[in-house]
Regions:
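Bacterial N-terminal signal peptides
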Residues: 14-24
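Intrinsic disorder/low-complexity segments
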Residues: 1, 23-27
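A short, basic/aromatic helix-end/turn motif that makes direct DNA contacts
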Residues: 228
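Glycoside hydrolase catalytic-domain context in secreted enzymes
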Residues: 26-27, 31-225
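Bacterial N-terminal signal peptides that target proteins for export
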Residues: 3-14
Length: 228
């Protein structure tokens, strides 16, 4: 790995940790603890706290934060679970699927209509309200991160997960997703946009080849800019 790649990887890792710190209430401490663990000092910005924490972590702890477990542990059937690191004051981190509400079979949560119906209203406030309620339920159930919203473009009506998205219009998709993310994160839960660009089929999606014309890619996926 080149020096620039290492710097980029470290920057992305630090940014991810900063996001977790900013949205996870568990990252608070007393004055005494903040002295021995400077990343627990809430007077610092999330970025500053993340940088101090990353500097204190060894390689195994960094790998731990990037891997975790899937569908195992005390929070089964959560989508993902990262056990705590007590020596650093890092709490457990629970992830659940969430494009249409919290998917967690252990506890009850509201099953919202398919996001495609929100897009049919042309009203971002509806997507924002769903995001806020889903975020509040996730927080109440002990979930820190939701895998949602989904805002890939529904280019193929036969796509098995098209119902999770906001339809085929790029700008509308970006607008609805923006409102949903803001609503979700207002509850203190991390939103996760999905799925990756040109992921338009579920079967063999990790090994299939998506051939997109050079013109279609920037035109059809301008919703990414709309979200930014």
């Amino acid at each position: 790995m080149s020096t620039s790649q290492k710097k980029t990887a470290r920057g992305l890792f630090t940014l991810g940790i900063a996001t977790v710190i900013a949205l996870t209430p568990s990252f608070t401490s007393s004055a005494a603890e903040a002295s021995s663990r400077p990343w627990m000092n809430t007077s610092l910005s999330p970025e500053q706290r993340a940088a101090k924490l990353v500097s204190a972590m060894d390689l195994s702890q960094k790998i731990h934060m990037l891997s975790g477990t899937k569908l195992t542990g005390p929070h089964t059937p959560a989508t993902g679970y990262i056990p705590p690191i007590p020596e650093l004051g890092i709490p457990e981190f629970v992830q659940s699927d969430g494009p249409a509400g919290v998917r967690n079979g252990k506890n009850h949560a509201t099953k919202f209509p398919a996001p495609l119906t929100y897009a049919s209203s042309w009203d971002p406030a509806i997507a924002g309200l769903e995001g806020r309620v889903a975020g509040e339920e996730a927080r109440a159930l002990g979930t820190d991160q939701l895998y949602g919203p989904g805002f890939n473009i529904a280019r193929n009506p036969l796509g098995g997960r098209g119902f999770e998205y906001y339809g085929e219009d790029p700008y509308l998709s970006g607008t609805m997703a923006t409102a949903n993310v803001k609503g979700m994160q207002s509850a203190g839960v991390i939103a996760t946009l999905k799925h990756y660009v040109t992921n338009n089929q579920e079967t063999s999606r990790h090994i299939s080849n998506s051939e997109v014309p050079e013109r279609a890619l920037p035109v059809s996926y301008t919703h990414l800019r709309a979200h930014e």
